[in-house]
């Protein structure tokens, strides 16, 4: 309501008094904030996709010459936490093991987990990525021919599998997991 009236808002915070007036509010898809960190590169591509892999969702935004194409904004309702939950549940059911951490296997790092558990984790992670790629393809996005910029902590976790999978033609990774919050 106060935005429409453009009135000043007075408040106290930590013992100091403030008076502010909000003149303009902009809202962007979450993935775009991360894209800005790579703008000089992205503006040279006629088309690129920002793929922000989070805990509960994977958000996708199409860019044309570095600018958001808001006609193509997708959200896949399965992030890495849903992957973890699936792996943990299946591992418990098949091997009566409670997994605390499967990141080492996903990152292809040394682990004490037995071979069959490692294979299960790799297999389920591969299926997770395939399901996501199919979700995109159903919406007209083909990662085998597109430049894809991956953001978020989930993308760094899955980076090795994405690169080794050879399904994404031009993967670029934003190393800063806080890029969306800048």
How should these model regions be labeled?
Residues 63-110:
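Glycine-rich phosphate-binding loop plus the immediately following alpha-helix
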Residues 51-55:
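Active-site-proximal alpha-helical scaffolds that flank and shape metal-associated catalytic sites
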Residues 58-62:
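Short beta-strand scaffold segments in enzyme catalytic cores
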Residues 1-48, 68-80, 106, 114-182:
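Nucleotide/phosphate-binding catalytic cleft detector across ATP-hydrolyzing
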């Amino acid at each position: 309501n106060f935005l429409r009236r453009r009135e000043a808002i007075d408040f106290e915070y930590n013992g100091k008094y403030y008076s502010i007036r909000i003149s303009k509010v902009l809202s962007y898809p979450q993935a775009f904030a991360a894209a800005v960190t790579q703008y000089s590169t992205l503006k040279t591509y006629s088309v690129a996709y920002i793929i922000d892999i989070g805990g509960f969702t994977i958000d996708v935004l199409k860019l044309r010459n570095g600018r958001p194409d808001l006609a193509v904004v997708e959200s896949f309702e399965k992030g890495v936490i849903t992957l973890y939950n699936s792996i943990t549940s299946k591992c418990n059911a098949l091997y009566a093991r409670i997994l605390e951490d499967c990141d080492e296997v996903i990152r292809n790092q040394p682990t004490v987990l037995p071979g069959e558990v490692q294979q299960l984790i790799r297999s389920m992670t591969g299926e997770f990525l395939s399901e996501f790629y199919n979700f995109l393809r159903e919406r007209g996005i083909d990662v085998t021919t597109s430049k894809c910029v991956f953001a978020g902590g989930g993308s760094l976790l899955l980076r090795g599998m994405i690169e080794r999978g050879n399904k994404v033609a031009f993967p670029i990774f934003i190393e800063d997991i806080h890029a969306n919050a800048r």
